[in-house]
Amino acid sequence: FGTAKDFRRLVKQIHDLDMKIILDWVANHSSPDNVWLDQCRQHWYTLDSAGYLQPTLGTDWWDVADLNYNNPEMRKEMINSLSFWVKEFDVDGFRCDVADYVPTDFWVDARKELDQIKPVFMLAEAENPAHHDFAFEMSYAWEFHHIMNGLANGEKSLRDVHEYFRNNRFKPSDFRMQFTSNHDENSWNGTEHERYGDQRLMYAALAATIEGMPLIYSGQEADFNRRLKFFDKDEIDWGDFALVPFYTKLFQLNKNNQALWNGEHGGQVRFESSSD
């Protein structure tokens, strides 16, 4: 996967292009052969009644070991590990996997430490308003994503869209990430072609112009139509990057129109009623 020198060069090139880079961070669990276990730190993990490693309660993730956030040593080392990537490689933040499975007070503590190094950007793979109070700028808009899926298959209506915004639990300053696909959706629930059919670009436009920040998943700019294997390396056929012009225009529209900006900097969705 390259060397530390390679990665530093990548980060610099990204910054030279006036872009930011955040890393995926899985704080809830580790592999069962993690180096921490080699170092006899089994007490950093959640153990079953027989003293064995176990997955996170309520999941079927038998290929991972749940971490014990009641252990202050483990929490400290997790924060040290996050800090390492900011100090040593100048990354700009983290996308935090299953953030709801980790205590919110840990994220608050981690954010305080990271911001002492430099201001970072934190994305929670969760949909919890409390995360935005102290630790995260952005969270996944899963509920709206499922509404879009439901609109496409006829299970939802515009009334559901109206209800979603009327019952919004998030503050205007909270960034919400909007998307039509991601690594979970593609592998487990189907490609955009499967879920949206010929309307996939219309829903992509909706996700990019509704309140929030749009995500484009690997392969969308190539109109890639295959479920990627979740646990194995599975390469994308990029072809001629068929949808690059579409997404370029869409994101330019998002960038150049203040009404489409994120959080409190942009506009808010309003609904007009009519008797016609």
Question: Which sequence ranges carry the predicted segments?
Answer:
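Conserved short secondary-structure transition element at the edge of the structured enzyme core
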Residues: 204-222
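Substrate-binding/active-site clefts of carbohydrate-active enzymes
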Residues: 1-89, 107-116
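Short loop/turn motifs at secondary-structure junctions
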Residues: 89-92, 212
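Carbohydrate-binding surface patches
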Residues: 270-276
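Conserved interdomain hinge at the start of the Helicase C-terminal
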Residues: 200-202
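The substrate-binding groove and active-site-proximal loops of carbohydrate-active enzymes
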Residues: 1-4, 60-76, 92-101, 144-155, ...
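Hydrophobic faces of well-ordered beta-strands that scaffold small-molecule active sites
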Residues: 21-23, 94, 122-124, 140, ...
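Active-site-proximal helices and loops of the catalytic beta/alpha 8
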Residues: 15, 81-83, 87, 97-176, ...
